[in-house]
Amino acid sequence: MKQLQLLMGMPITVEVVDPSVTEADIERVFAYFRAVDDTFSTYKEHSEISKVNRGELCEEEYSNEMKTILALSEQTRQETRGYFDIQHNGMVDPSGIVKGWAILQAAHMLKEAGFSNFYIDAGGDIQVAGNKDGEPWRIGIRNPFERKEIVKVLSVTDKGIATSGTAIRGQHIYDPHHPDTPLQDIVSLTIIGPNVYEADRFATAAFAMGKRGIYFIEQLAGFEGYMIDASARATFTSGFERYVLQHDNTHR
């Protein structure tokens, strides 16, 4: 069963490969994403993050989810030498980590419900589990210069995939060390990681590093990356190609 809804300002697709899955099972996942949006959306006046930014809550009043995200954000800032930073212009915006974290929590929900073969895609960040019809999941990496074109097809099982770039949302990632300088040397960076939370946070940080980001990913155990720069040149990590499905243009 496969369903799509527009939530958190993006399309979210949930596909579960199991004859016993019901619409209620999938709706619980979408309900969870709605709750996450109600907590962390900086566009909603009454969200918890908006109240935090207005100084209406003290730390003791933060929800457990807020405390978790803020702690994970600080951990990521330290692990990336400050290239991941949720504070900008005196405001806190954890969107660079919330999406991957929420997808992973949704995946845990499906596993706890007894499902082992599924796919969750929220705005291009993806968690897959098990397989589809006995084969690994196939995930396409789009050409940032021509969105209808697939440049690589990945074959993955039990992995997270996250892409950071400027093709869809424009300039929304910045280098915290030079916040007023637009990132123009790369346009897309796709990361394969042990789960989508890990892939998402490091994709955001590595993109902020510019062309050096792919070398940061190379040094991370358990991660692979594929970068496309502003000249349409691709650079990828040493183990990336083992996930590439050769001579096949079909994709999810």
Regions found by a protein language model. Give the residues of each.
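Mature catalytic core of soluble alpha/beta enzymes
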Residues: 1-252
